[in-house]
């Protein structure tokens, strides 16, 4: 029976940081990742059928984008070595200090994490878009803030992207991959610089995007950590005398693997970690003393999207980094609603979907595509669209649990989400209304998507909570360092532990919390 000192489940912003730092401390680290290891030449195109992940048949379909549908809420998740960094929009920003003043363990405050925010920014090579590389969307954002008399709220956001100061869109073949300049990062990995090709969310072909496999995970492997792709963990059980046994489905070999570890770190993301622990407590009964707070306190982080159209303005949403700038209303000055407006971009894959009215049927059925196609009925050119995006600080109104399947009502083994939209309504509606105001002042045309206006449906790529950190077992699932109450040496370190909405992109916060957790390691 294989035994290691530290077993990490998942390789996103929590798992990657922990793998790196614990390997540096000399631990024998093994990382089990459900998805594949992706290279630029493997990245999906609109013609491919297998780039989506299917949780019901992962042996057959193990692409890197996992869409989950939970009634009124849909969640987009990453699947692959690097986790959510494979599909996120590069934004690497710290929340305002007041976020940590309520609902967090006493040990966690902004000052506690300040140095960890700095270190994670260095590891991710965080930069901002050079002034001469502003996209039409960036300029529209600046104009909108200015016309509302709120220029002070506008800012270019920090991104985990490498930019070439000599690049500009006036170059011949400016968007050609050949314009990318290669360089070697601190972990010895070859990367390129951004050529504004617009495919950040679905795979940077020049490796300008600083995904975790190029930094934290690369460093972990340098220090002896082993990453095993296509290993889907199904259960964890404690061992007599200490440690844990983990059962994983090896999707490549189509075989079961059992591994024992002194310490186990669950880092499968908000949905993945919560589901795994729910199954261990309620389905397999291997971790029966997990807190009753498990699954509760989940939030979509208030993500919202409004497509706007400018008939006389070329905005080229499929060019440039996916998100470049923000207009910050996190101070609550808009009637108490707190939100962070961003310019959105759409990768060429989704752009092609819309241009051709949805030739990829599974993606065409997603709520994002439905919202976009709703506004294509008058055949307004895709290049004239502004995807207003953003996050809002909603109240956690979600609870994950295991429910019944209609065809097997005697079993409770299907992950369900009970989500109360009323706890998100004030913040999300404030963001939605702001999108309309920004559109109007800049001469565009937009309506709040019917999916929200009529049905109160949302989609989020930034799920948070489910294994919330707290000071007591009654309040949460893990303590300030991510250790699970009642189960020594079992940890959760990822977005599942964040006990509330941040109101902006969460990757930097998750990385900083993981840096903090690793620093507590003994």
Regions found by a protein language model. Give the residues of each.
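FAD cofactor-binding and catalytic pocket of flavoenzymes
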Residues: 63, 69, 106, 291-413, ...
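Beta1/beta-strand and adjacent pyrophosphate-binding region of the FAD-binding site
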Residues: 1-14, 266
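A glycine-rich dinucleotide-binding beta-alpha-beta segment and adjacent secondary-structure elements
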Residues: 62, 197-200, 238, 414-500
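Glycine-rich loop(s) and the adjacent beta-strand/alpha-helix scaffold that form part
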Residues: 24, 28, 35-45, 206-209, ...
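Residue-level detector of alpha-helix initiation sites
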Residues: 12-13, 271, 422, 497
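Glycine-rich phosphate/pyrophosphate-binding beta-alpha loops
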Residues: 80, 84, 495-507
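Conserved redox-cofactor binding core of oxidoreductases
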Residues: 110-230, 454-459
